[in-house]
Amino acid sequence: MPELPEVETVRRGLAPHLEGREITRVQLNRKDLRFPFPEGFAERLQGAQITSFTRRAKYLMAGLNKPQAPVFYWLSHLGMTGRFRLYPSSGKATNLGQAVEPGQYAHNVSPETAEKHVHVLLTLDDGSVLTYADPRRFGFMDLVDGAPDNTPFLAHLGPEPLSNDFHAAHLLKAFATRKSPIKNALLDQKIVSGLGNIYVCEALFMAGISPKRLACNVGLTRLERLVPVIRQVLQAAIDAGGSTLRDFPASDGKLGYFQHQFLL
């Protein structure tokens, strides 16, 4: 499962190429991922300009604008094996099947020319093509009207661990009645968003805190030691391109290297 650094690596790789571009064509090769695509998904994306490409927790969010329409957002979650790839106008992705009308599904993609498990293709106004492949199909996409938090996927997320809202006092309050191990508490996205098993284990080890220690028994002194370590581990992973092993290359296909720095 990709965690915050992996998703942020993808965002940083794609944002310069997506922001300001218009989506001119949408091709869906199936009607669902983990969940069905929202009604009118392809039609709404086509003709929209990407005004921003951001991240919230483990979600990617594209801010979209269409003439005479309210701003809306395209939300994506990579699941376990989802990956975006961006191909230039001369790239092989332009050969992935024939153009289809928005809302239709293409099943005539040639195995000789298609990358495996590509389920979504977006053509941009500069001729480049963004593909989304997901062998296990645990990822999903949604469209959100108005503010991004107008979806249950984001509404109850805790603070970002790299933000000023994440501090020892926040954890002390959140852990006060938690009788689960601190590792489990840190994995609760309502307490802090974006953390997963890899970086929680690494941060706890570096901070000298047992992952089995009950969250309610972790005092302020230990939490004041833990918070900067979490930030340090995440930032180091982002700078290294994530801890990609196999399923999560960056948008250009390059692997991350933070796994070579693991202490645990």
Indicate residue ranges for each PLM-predicted region:
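Structured catalytic/nucleic-acid-binding cores of DNA maintenance enzymes
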Residues: 1-264
